[in-house]
């Protein structure tokens, strides 16, 4: 007769986890009891395995149980039986392995030196490595020493054969990855008593490797800043240092994790060693930055270069350039109230209420008509009701902090009997802005994360010999349209002006002049400090002038166009004109300002030499023309069995001024593309305007 009893707590976790580490996690929360009546040991262990949904692998071991056995956990139950009946046990892959203690053995397993650490990690991850049994490594020789039950040693040996050893001669070397857009090294911004550190690609990659090697996820990591492992920003002296936002460059964290797992588990991936040095395996991987060449240096196996390239490509992406124009001004609160009353909803230029600047309230205002608002401010500045404190402008990359600081530092001396300390006290106006470009329904917008501190050093009311600091802080974020402005107010101040009026000469007479010929007056004015921030999208790191409507290239083209008109009266198109026409034709629209011609004024083959493998279809063509130039559209076809590229340089005749192919320049066998060719009208050239008769008799001009 046998009977099994179990007590399960109310919060017991399920007994079938996906991966068991040596012993099931549920065993820690479960008590076990077994009531045996002349029960064979094999039968008792089979009942035990059945209760926990496991298989039993056990050779014949003699023993009979005749008692009621209670244990605090299943592990304790097996240990008690093992001591009494001289057997060893371990759990792996939902199987309980039991073997006599006499079958305890040891083995020497040879692996590569780079795979020693990875074999131990792999055995731990799959739940096979048991700390109760012996384990030792000889990293320089590439040898693992293991001791335990025969079945346990056999499983370890089988796993060691699955670890791929690196090819001969494939030793670690320095791999160089030059960067185009991102910074390889960390950037440090010293900001008063704080230190902002924006991590470079080398630090980000090292942090990713460290985090992933410990089983952590990179989804919550701050990939811009660095202040220790996984933190975004390092504060040099302030615990209230704000964190930088996460990158918006479109990082695919899932792809990054997969690539990192390949690096870390491909023949021994690695992270930076902390503490003692270890030989071989992931401890030998090192990542550093080459500041001179803006490159990332990785010391690892050259065979993993492709894996690192995929990771670095996700980080080395171009970002937008944003210019931030800031206007800091003090304005009389009475005039400000009148100004805000004129800039309400009825004006249609401000997204806010008419009473945004009431007394005792902080203010945030959006301006869309910046020109009219600036005119109002200039008028107030002219009559003395407003004064501009500063008008700085700074250019920065999106998601990178821009800091503007106007501060004053006083030094406070604290003396004692033998010690004198000097503490700096800093106050003033500081502005920290982190911009980010957005696209909402095709309309560009800019998100601003703003931190403002405004303060000044005054004389203390308690001790005249000690300074007093008055500060105000604003931390906010907003999304505004491009070319709009954000106004932040709420910094109130009281300004007192003492004026003395006296009669010349008589007012300087002692005693009498002060009483009879002088008068004093004090004017108190309440002022509010405003911060007007205007972000402008300049471009990106690939083409900084991409978003400039009147950039330098177009200005040069316009001036050259005017010079050409004065020289020969012809109006030749600029690059912008040709690009605009080609874009309209790609979109399926007829070019503006051009009429549809019936036939081409040129022979098809005279426009372009298609080259070997390509042919131009003369039956299918279009011609759009204006007075001085036009665009011919022909069809190019690949007649070969290999991909062929349309070479635009072959369309470089005397009349051609621009060429483009759509939808593809590379044509697969049998594929066709349209070729747009911008050409000058023959009649506008000087040869067409003027003719010269030939001196040869019978020759045609």
Curated annotation (Swiss-Prot):
Known role: Component of the type III secretion system (T3SS), also called injectisome, which is used to inject bacterial effector proteins into eukaryotic host cells. Forms a ring-shaped multimeric structure with an apparent central pore in the outer membrane. Involved in the secretion of a proteinaceous elicitor of the hypersensitivity response in plants.
Record protein name field: Type 3 secretion system secretin
Q: Where are the transmembrane segments?
A: none
Gene behind this chain? sctC
- Similarity comment: Belongs to the bacterial secretin family. T3SS SctC subfamily.
Q: Which residues form the signal peptide?
A: 1-21
Tagged with keyword Nucleotide-binding = no
Under the heading Pfam families, the entry gives: Secretin, Secretin_N
Indicate where this protein resides in the cell.
Cell outer membrane
Listed InterPro entries: Bact_Secretion_Sys_Channel, NolW-like, NolW-like_sf, T2SS/T3SS_dom, T2SS_GspD_CS, T3SS_OM_pore_YscC
Q: List the GO terms this entry assigns under cellular component, sorted alphabetically.
A: cell outer membrane; type II protein secretion system complex; type III protein secretion system complex
Subunit: The core secretion machinery of the T3SS is composed of approximately 20 different proteins, including cytoplasmic components, a base, an export apparatus and a needle. This subunit is part of the base, which anchors the injectisome in the bacterial cell envelope. Forms a stable homooligomeric complex.
What are the record keywords, sorted? Cell outer membrane, Hypersensitive response elicitation, Membrane, Protein transport, Signal, Translocation, Transport
Polar residues composition-biased segments: 240-252
């Amino acid at each position: 007769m046998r009977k099994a009893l179990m007590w399960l707590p109310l919060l017991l976790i399920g007994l079938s986890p996906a991966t068991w580490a040596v012993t099931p996690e549920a065993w820690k929360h479960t008590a076990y009891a077994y009531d045996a009546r002349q029960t064979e040991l094999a039968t008792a262990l089979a009942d035990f395995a059945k209760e926990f949904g496991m298989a039993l692998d056990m050779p014949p071991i003699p023993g009979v149980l005749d008692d009621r056995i209670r244990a605090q956990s299943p592990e304790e139950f097996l240990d008690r039986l093992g001591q009494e009946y001289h057997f060893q046990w371990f759990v792996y892959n939902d199987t309980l392995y039991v073997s006599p203690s006499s079958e305890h053995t040891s083995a020497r397993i040879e692996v590569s030196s780079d795979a020693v650490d990875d074999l131990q990690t792999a055995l731990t991850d799959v739940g096979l490595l048991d700390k109760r049994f012996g384990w030792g490594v000889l990293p320089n020789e590439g040898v693992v020493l293991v001791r335990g039950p025969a079945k346990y040693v056999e499983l370890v040996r089988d796993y060691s054969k699955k670890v791929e050893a690196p090819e001969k001669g494939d030793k670690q070397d320095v791999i160089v990855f030059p960067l185009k857009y991102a910074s390889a090294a960390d950037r440090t911004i010293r900001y008063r008593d704080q230190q902002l550190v924006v991590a470079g690609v080398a630090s980000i990659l090292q942090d990713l490797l460290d985090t992933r090697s410990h089983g952590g996820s990179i989804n919550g990591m701050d990939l811009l800043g660095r202040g220790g492992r996984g933190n975004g920003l390092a504060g040099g002296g302030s615990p209230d240092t704000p964190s930088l936002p996460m990158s918006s460059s479109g990082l695919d964290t899932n792809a990054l994790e997969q690539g990192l797992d390949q690096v870390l588990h491909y023949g021994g991936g690695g992270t930076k060693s902390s503490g003692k040095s270890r030989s071989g395996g992931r401890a030998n991987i090192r990542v550093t930055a080459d500041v001179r060449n803006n490159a990332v240096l990785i010391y690892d196996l050259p065979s993993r270069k492709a894996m690192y390239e995929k990771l670095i490509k996700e980080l080395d992406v171009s970002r937008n350039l944003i210019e931030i124009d800031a206007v800091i001004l003090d304005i009389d609160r009475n005039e400000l109230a009148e100004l805000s009353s004129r800039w309400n909803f009825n004006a249609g230029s401000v997204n806010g209420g008419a009473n945004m600047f009431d007394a005792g309230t902080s203010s945030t205002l959006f301006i869309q008509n910046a020109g009219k608002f600036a005119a109002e401010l200039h008028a107030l500045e002219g009559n003395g009701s407003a004064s501009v404190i500063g008008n700085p402008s700074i250019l920065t990359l999106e998601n990178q902090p821009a800091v503007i600081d106007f501060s004053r530092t006083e030094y406070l001396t604290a003396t004692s009997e033998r010690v004198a300390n000097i503490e700096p006290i800093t106050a003033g106006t500081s502005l920290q802005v982190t911009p980010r470009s957005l696209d909402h329904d095709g309309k560009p917008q800019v998100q601003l994360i703003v931190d403002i501190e405004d303060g000044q050093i005054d004389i203390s009311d308690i001790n005249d010999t000690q300074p007093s600091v008055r500060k105000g802080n604003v931390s906010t974020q907003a999304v505004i349209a491009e070319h709009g402005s954000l106004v932040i107010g709420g910094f109130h101040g009281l300004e007192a002006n003492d004026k003395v009026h006296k009669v010349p000469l008589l007012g300087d007479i002692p005693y009498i002049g002060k009483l009879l010929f002088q008068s004093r007056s004090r004017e108190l004015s309440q002022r509010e400090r405003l911060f007007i921030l205007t972000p402008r999208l300049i471009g990106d790191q690939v083409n900084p002038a991409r978003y400039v409507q009147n950039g330098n290239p177009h200005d040069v083209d316009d001036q050259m166009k005017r010079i050409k008109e004065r020289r020969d009266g012809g109006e030749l198109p600029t690059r912008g004109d040709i690009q605009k026409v080609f874009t309209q034709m790609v979109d399926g629209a007829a070019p503006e300002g051009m009429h549809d011609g019936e036939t081409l004024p040129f022979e098809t083959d005279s426009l372009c030499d298609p080259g070997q493998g390509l042919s131009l279809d003369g039956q299918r063509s279009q011609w759009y023309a204006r007075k001085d130039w036009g665009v011919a559209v022909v069809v190019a076809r690949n007649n070969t069995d290999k991909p062929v590229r349309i070479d635009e340089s072959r369309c470089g005749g005397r009349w051609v001024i621009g060429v483009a192919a759509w939808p593809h320049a590379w044509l697969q066998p049998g594929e066709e593309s349209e070729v747009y060719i911008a050409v000058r009208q023959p009649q506008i050239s000087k040869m067409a305007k003027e003719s010269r008769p030939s001196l040869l008799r019978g020759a045609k001009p």
